[in-house]
Amino acid sequence: MDKYGILKHYFGYDSFRPGQEKLVDAILAGQDVLGIMPTGAGKSLCYQVPALLMSGITLVVSPLISLMKDQVGALNQAGVHAAYINSSLTDNQITKALAFAKQGRYKIIYVAPERLETWGFLDFATHVEISMITVDEAHCISQWGQDFRPSYLNILSFVKKLARRPIISAFTATATSKVRDDILQILSLERPVILTTGFDRSNLTFKVKHIKDKDSYILDYLVSHRQDSGIIYCATRKNVEKVYDMLNANGLSVTKYHAGLSAEERKENQDSFIYDIKPVVVATNAFGMGIDKSNVRFVIHYNMPQCIENYYQEAGRAGRDGEDSECVLLYSPQDIMINKFFIEHRESNPDIDAEEQARLMILDKRRLNAMVDYCKTTGCLREYILKYFGERPDNPEGGRYNCHNCSNCVVDEAEQEADEAYMYPGNRFSAPVSRNAAMVADRMKRSAAAAKSAYATSKSKKPEDALNDRGVMLFNRLRELRKQIAVSVGVPPYVIFSDRTLIDMCLKVPFNEEEMLSVSGVGENKYERYGKVFMDEIYDFLDGMKQNLAR
């Protein structure tokens, strides 16, 4: 089987996305690679496809347990034998997994960077053929990155202890030129193929709101996006609790996530979000890295993040499936002071000397200034982000850059009028924030501004907008079926099939194996597992429609 056969058989795709094939070919030719690709561009396939074509094992160094579980779960569902080794497993489970790996059962093993330093894992690694080491979230290796992890610095020493140097591939979605240079140097990549597909996420609409009544804004937004999944980020636990309580009191289906909750609560709440039981989560920035939920339709920042890197990473959790989604930042000057406090009172890193820590604090304050400038710019928000990462977008129109997809480039009078109603807390309604869903609906009726707001007139389209009314009904039926299957097999719904795959089913209406395998995202293993039950659901839906028409 060649690379195209692997792509179709396991992952259900007929062709590679831009940039993927170049990196796959480089790896198969034995070259090191560095892929800097935006979230949702398909970085994982760049190493997963060649891993299945090489003779040995591919080790994927990954920073988060949740990310490993998601990736391994998705691979297993696709028919790929993969495993993860991290602290969530017992010693017995780790011993068993490594024994299976020695027997050749696993082609891909995800491992935490700390695990590379243990004698047991090194002993395993020196007795098996390792074809490639993939460094995921590679920006974690740089002290200049926003997510520096000292354990990443030990990857190269691990490589040097192996009998034969494997191919090294590294991937990240966010890397300034300084971080990129660190990745190349610290991992000692040899004549690497470097691919930057660009940081632009054209499916994301960026908005900055200078408003004071943030609670009313969020409440109205969620009321008008009841069917959508989203994340609301807050800077503090206190704000998470406040926003969660307000939304919950108004009858909205939300959950919460922050470090103050017990491990059991965090897992339960995270699962509620991932499994679409609670479509919206209110969280601190501790939430999200490693969450591969593809159908997040909006990310709202209740507070301004500390830097553009953090903002773009967090906002980038919207629209991973490539469908239109919104990223809204609610700015207030108080956010600057909160972030300065966090920077100046950050816990010292014992792995960095005092002089270096002082330099990093200066850098963090510069990053904060850049974040504030983003919130205050009157120019294109997308252009600001791209230039920050060293990319200059094409401007064929000349003059001021216009992306036609941010709040500074698209002036919506109805949206501006709606925003004016949120300028002063308490100005918009005579009563305080409503305490139940009925009152929320009444507020929406009574507020002309809200009725005309961009939530109803937004230019961004929902994925299912490609469908007619019956198609949307079928899409919702298939989503419900997907949720039931996901719960029964214990994986997130998007691991079964993405929204994009379900929409393609609704458009193609498959009734046999050949037709189902033509649906984007349906590989042979997924067809064997779920093809018939989804085709039966489609048939039952259409049969019901026919009977209704016959009456």
PLM features: what roles do these ranges have?
Residues 66:
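Conserved Rossmann-like nucleotide-cofactor binding loop
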Residues 1-3, 337-338, 347-356, 363-365, ...:
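Accessory DNA-binding and partner-docking regions appended to nucleic-acid-acting proteins
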Residues 1-10, 14, 18, 22-44, ...:
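Helicase motor core with emphasis on the C-terminal RecA-like subdomain
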Residues 20-23, 371, 502:
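Short alpha-helical "packing" element that flanks the helix-turn-helix/winged-helix DNA-binding module
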Residues 26, 301, 374, 504-505:
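Short alpha-helical segment immediately N-terminal to, or the first helix within
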